[in-house]
Amino acid sequence: MQYIAFDAHKHYTLASVATPDGQLVREERIEHDREALRQFLGRCERGSPVAVETVGNWYWIVDEIEAAACIPKLVHARKAKLMMGMINKTDKLDARGLNRLQRNGTLPTVWIPPGALRDQRDLPRTRMVLVRQRTQLKNRIHATLAKYALHDLEVSDLFGARGRALLRQRLALLPPHTAYATEHLLEQIESLDRQVDGF
């Protein structure tokens, strides 16, 4: 068995491979390309644990580790940094530190959801982004109406059926360019409504 640690970045990973007694076998920079990672993992002992920090691109890296019959260990990055206590950080020191924590049995890991669940999690995350965008657009329309003292509509929901009818009437009272921009914001909100309903 070998201990493998990945200090992953956006475009590359620095890999460190060590023996159970801590002897460094090799360190290698791997460009973020599936084939390059497969080739690297193909030279590693099957069943070896691979520590990977929870950076934004860990999904595909974990998939490749599993496909290579190695054991992914998803690291809680902040806790690991505290435990390593390094002041002068470098990629090599990070990877070596992760391996040291693995060998000591103190590597702070988090649960790795199965691939199907990771995929499903994108649905609520995307819905949340769309809802946030819609809220920003609604707030902008509220601010536009307030700028021109047209915000005194007698409705509880400006973007409900009755509120939108009143809002379209108020658009005629806005200056032409502002009305044009607000109409486009309203169209975006309607488009986002349909998209959010699809989730």
Task: For each feature predicted by the language model, list its residue ranges.
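A detector of single, family-specific signature residues
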Residues: 1-199
